[in-house]
């Protein structure tokens, strides 16, 4: 009987963990699943002399800044979240939609001002799933309804959809939503060493949060509700791989131990080999016996276009060869804690 009770308790616990990761959409707009043109907010585009407003530019991924490269069109600008259009506007055209948390969590940051970030007024919520921290981010809000330290449940109103931040007007009002991994608790030291401008947002600056493909996760969970964020990360396509000195802090491995491939060394390895998605999401970490003195590129996917255009400018070159750019090296140092 005791064994049965323990088994039942374990099943209940696992069910709770899985259900906690079944994400809700942040607004009443649920058209993602059947009419994406009604879900994503459009972007203004001027390409080849034609001005258009494609909704596709509001999706996650390399969906902006089209350019002709040979006979193909490549999109070089990466968009790290989902831009969700409003369903309700008042007589003046201002959106009225409430923005809710996509899952249970704790508010860790609520921007005090709308003028200190491209995100405008934004909120970050921490979710602890399977022993790992994930951070959802809600940007361009007209107003905030929560404060840091506040516990929230899925659907709890965080704020009102708006158009704060740079480059957005009333007609393009939307909430920009991300689901991120956290890179470094020493972010402020890294930022101070690399930028002359002040960091107004502490460790919850967008540069310290790297997004997973939230759009794909929503669609996948629709078919398979038990799919977790960790599953989604591990299923992401590899973009490039970097060797990093073994004395790198590798905080990502402490926060996301499921990134480790193979066994964890007893001490510091000679080096680490870290696999990233094309946009820089850490996908795997493996200890190596080959000593290196500084981060360098060991592999990059040949996407048939210059690497710069499909790696957010982190890798230069083309074909099967490439190397980290200055921006790429700076990013890898942050992601791996080698600074």
Where are these regions (language model features)?
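A short, hydrophobic/aromatic-rich structural module that often spans a beta strand
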Residues: 128-138, 154-161, 228-237
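Residues that cap or initiate secondary-structure elements
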Residues: 88-90, 131, 142-145, 183
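N-terminal secretory signal peptides that target proteins for export/translocation
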Residues: 1-3
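Bacterial N-terminal signal peptides
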Residues: 5-16
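Surface-exposed strand-loop junctions at beta-sheet edges and helix termini
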Residues: 102, 146-147, 152
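Surface-exposed, glycine-biased beta-strand/turn segments
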Residues: 21-121, 163, 200-339
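Conserved, short, structured surface segments that act as functional micro-motifs
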Residues: 116-126, 150-224
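Zn2+-dependent peptidoglycan hydrolase active-site motif and core
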Residues: 94-96, 100-143, 170-172, 176
């Amino acid at each position: 009987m005791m064994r049965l009770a323990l088994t039942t308790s374990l099943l209940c616990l696992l069910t709770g963990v899985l259900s906690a990761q079944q994400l809700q959409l942040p607004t009443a707009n649920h058209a993602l699943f059947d009419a994406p043109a009604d879900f994503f907010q459009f972007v203004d585009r001027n390409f080849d002399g034609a001005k258009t407003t494609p909704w596709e530019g509001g999706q996650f991924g390399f969906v902006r800044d089209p350019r002709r490269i040979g006979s193909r069109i490549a999109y070089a600008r990466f968009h790290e979240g989902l831009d969700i259009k409003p369903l309700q506007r008042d007589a003046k055209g201002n959106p009225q939609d409430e923005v809710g948390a996509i899952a249970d969590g704790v508010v860790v940051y609520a921007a005090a001002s709308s003028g200190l970030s491209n995100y405008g007024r934004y909120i970050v919520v921490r979710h602890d799933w399977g022993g790992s921290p994930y951070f959802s981010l809600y940007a361009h809000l007209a107003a905030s309804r929560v404060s840091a330290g506040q516990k929230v449940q899925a659907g709890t109103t965080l704020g009102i959809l708006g158009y704060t931040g740079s480059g957005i007007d009333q007609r393009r009002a939307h909430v920009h939503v991300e689901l991120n991994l956290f890179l470094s608790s020493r972010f402020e030291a890294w930022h101070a060493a690399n930028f002359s401008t002040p960091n107004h947002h502490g460790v919850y600056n967008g540069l310290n949060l790297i997004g997973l493909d939230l759009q794909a996760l929503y669609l996948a969970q629709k078919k398979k509700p038990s799919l977790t964020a960790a599953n989604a990360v591990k299923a992401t396509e590899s973009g490039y791989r970097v060797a990093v000195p073994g004395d790198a802090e590798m905080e990502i491995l402490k926060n996301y131990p499921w990134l480790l491939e193979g066994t964890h060394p007893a001490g510091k390895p000679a080096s680490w080999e870290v696999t990233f998605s094309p946009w820089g999401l850490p996908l795997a970490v493996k200890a190596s016996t080959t000593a290196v003195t500084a981060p360098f590129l060991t592999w990059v996917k040949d996407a048939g276009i210059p690497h710069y255009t499909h790696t957010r400018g982190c890798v230069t070159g083309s074909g099967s060869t490439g190397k980290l750019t200055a921006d790429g090296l700076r990013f890898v140092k942050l992601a791996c804690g080698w600074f």
